[in-house]
Protein backbone atom coordinates (compact mmCIF):
# COMPACT_ATOMS: atom_id res chain seq x y z
CA UNK A 1 0.00 0.00 0.00
CA UNK A 2 2.81 2.38 0.87
CA UNK A 3 4.50 1.62 -2.47
CA UNK A 4 1.31 2.57 -4.34
CA UNK A 5 1.06 5.87 -2.48
CA UNK A 6 4.70 6.63 -3.25
CA UNK A 7 4.23 5.94 -6.96
CA UNK A 8 1.11 8.09 -7.12
CA UNK A 9 3.03 10.98 -5.58
CA UNK A 10 5.60 10.78 -8.39
CA UNK A 11 3.04 11.54 -11.08
CA UNK A 12 3.21 15.25 -10.41
CA UNK A 13 0.29 17.67 -10.62
CA UNK A 14 -2.74 16.73 -12.71
CA UNK A 15 -2.80 17.92 -16.31
CA UNK A 16 -4.97 21.03 -16.45
CA UNK A 17 -4.50 21.69 -20.17
CA UNK A 18 -7.78 23.01 -21.57
CA UNK A 19 -9.53 20.60 -23.90
CA UNK A 20 -12.18 21.13 -26.55
CA UNK A 21 -14.60 18.90 -24.64
CA UNK A 22 -18.08 19.55 -25.97
CA UNK A 23 -16.97 22.20 -28.47
CA UNK A 24 -19.07 22.69 -31.60
CA UNK A 25 -17.34 23.63 -34.85
CA UNK A 26 -20.78 24.55 -36.25
CA UNK A 27 -21.32 27.07 -33.45
CA UNK A 28 -17.73 28.27 -33.89
CA UNK A 29 -18.42 28.98 -37.57
CA UNK A 30 -21.37 31.18 -36.57
CA UNK A 31 -19.31 32.89 -33.88
CA UNK A 32 -16.59 34.02 -36.31
CA UNK A 33 -19.34 35.96 -38.10
CA UNK A 34 -21.07 37.18 -34.92
CA UNK A 35 -17.84 38.31 -33.25
CA UNK A 36 -16.62 40.15 -36.36
CA UNK A 37 -13.67 37.90 -37.26
CA UNK A 38 -14.83 37.97 -40.90
CA UNK A 39 -14.14 41.72 -41.04
CA UNK A 40 -10.39 41.06 -40.97
CA UNK A 41 -9.94 37.40 -41.99
CA UNK A 42 -11.06 35.24 -44.89
CA UNK A 43 -12.65 31.85 -44.30
CA UNK A 44 -13.31 29.12 -46.88
CA UNK A 45 -17.06 28.97 -46.29
CA UNK A 46 -17.72 32.72 -45.95
CA UNK A 47 -18.24 34.51 -49.25
CA UNK A 48 -18.78 37.99 -47.82
CA UNK A 49 -17.34 39.94 -46.17
CA UNK A 50 -13.85 38.78 -46.99
CA UNK A 51 -11.55 40.79 -44.76
CA UNK A 52 -8.02 41.50 -45.87
CA UNK A 53 -6.42 43.12 -42.83
CA UNK A 54 -5.63 39.84 -41.05
CA UNK A 55 -4.27 36.66 -42.60
CA UNK A 56 -6.47 34.22 -44.47
CA UNK A 57 -7.58 31.40 -42.21
CA UNK A 58 -8.62 29.12 -45.07
CA UNK A 59 -6.11 26.41 -44.11
CA UNK A 60 -5.53 27.34 -40.49
CA UNK A 61 -6.05 23.79 -39.21
CA UNK A 62 -2.86 22.57 -40.87
CA UNK A 63 -0.65 25.46 -39.71
CA UNK A 64 1.92 24.69 -37.04
CA UNK A 65 1.97 28.16 -35.52
CA UNK A 66 -0.54 30.77 -34.42
CA UNK A 67 0.47 34.27 -35.57
CA UNK A 68 3.77 32.76 -36.67
CA UNK A 69 4.90 32.44 -33.04
CA UNK A 70 2.76 30.20 -30.84
CA UNK A 71 2.20 26.44 -31.14
CA UNK A 72 -1.12 25.71 -32.83
CA UNK A 73 -2.59 23.66 -30.00
CA UNK A 74 -6.17 23.85 -28.70
CA UNK A 75 -5.34 25.36 -25.30
CA UNK A 76 -3.11 28.04 -26.79
CA UNK A 77 -5.61 28.83 -29.55
CA UNK A 78 -8.46 29.19 -27.04
CA UNK A 79 -6.41 31.81 -25.20
CA UNK A 80 -5.34 33.53 -28.41
CA UNK A 81 -8.84 33.98 -29.87
CA UNK A 82 -9.94 35.67 -26.64
CA UNK A 83 -6.92 37.85 -25.93
CA UNK A 84 -4.33 37.87 -28.70
CA UNK A 85 -2.52 41.01 -27.42
CA UNK A 86 -1.72 39.27 -24.11
CA UNK A 87 0.08 36.49 -25.99
CA UNK A 88 1.52 38.46 -28.91
CA UNK A 89 2.14 42.06 -27.84
CA UNK A 90 1.82 44.51 -30.70
CA UNK A 91 -0.55 42.33 -32.73
CA UNK A 92 -3.26 44.12 -34.69
CA UNK A 93 -5.78 41.54 -33.52
CA UNK A 94 -7.89 42.91 -30.67
CA UNK A 95 -9.04 41.10 -27.57
CA UNK A 96 -12.49 39.61 -28.25
CA UNK A 97 -15.12 39.26 -25.56
CA UNK A 98 -16.26 35.63 -25.46
CA UNK A 99 -17.01 32.94 -22.93
CA UNK A 100 -14.85 29.87 -22.38
CA UNK A 101 -17.41 27.81 -24.33
CA UNK A 102 -17.38 30.26 -27.24
CA UNK A 103 -13.56 30.13 -27.30
CA UNK A 104 -13.75 26.32 -27.43
CA UNK A 105 -16.28 26.48 -30.27
CA UNK A 106 -14.23 28.96 -32.32
CA UNK A 107 -11.11 26.86 -31.72
CA UNK A 108 -12.92 23.70 -32.86
CA UNK A 109 -14.02 25.49 -36.04
CA UNK A 110 -10.58 26.92 -36.82
CA UNK A 111 -8.94 23.52 -36.41
CA UNK A 112 -11.29 22.06 -39.05
CA UNK A 113 -10.01 24.49 -41.69
CA UNK A 114 -7.74 22.40 -43.90
CA UNK A 115 -7.14 22.34 -47.66
CA UNK A 116 -9.51 20.10 -49.56
PLM segments and residue spans:
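Electrostatic cytochrome c docking/interface patches
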Residues: 11-33
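Axial heme c-ligation environment in periplasmic c-type cytochrome domains
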Residues: 51-60, 80-113
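Detector for the c-type heme attachment site
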Residues: 11-12, 40-47, 62, 82, ...
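C-terminal motif of bacterial Sec signal peptides marking the signal peptidase cleavage site
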Residues: 6-9
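Gly/Gly-Pro-rich "capping" loops immediately C-terminal to redox-active cysteine motifs
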Residues: 25, 29-31, 43-78
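The canonical Cys-X-X-Cys-His
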Residues: 28, 34-44, 93, 106-109
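Stable alpha-helical elements in mature extracytoplasmic
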Residues: 24, 36, 73, 77, ...
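Short sequence/structural segments immediately N-terminal
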Residues: 25, 31-32, 87-88, 115-116
Amino acid sequence: MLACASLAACDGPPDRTPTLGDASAVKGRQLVADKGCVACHTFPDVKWPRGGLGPSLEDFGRQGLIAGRLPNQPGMLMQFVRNAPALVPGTAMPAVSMTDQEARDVTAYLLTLKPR
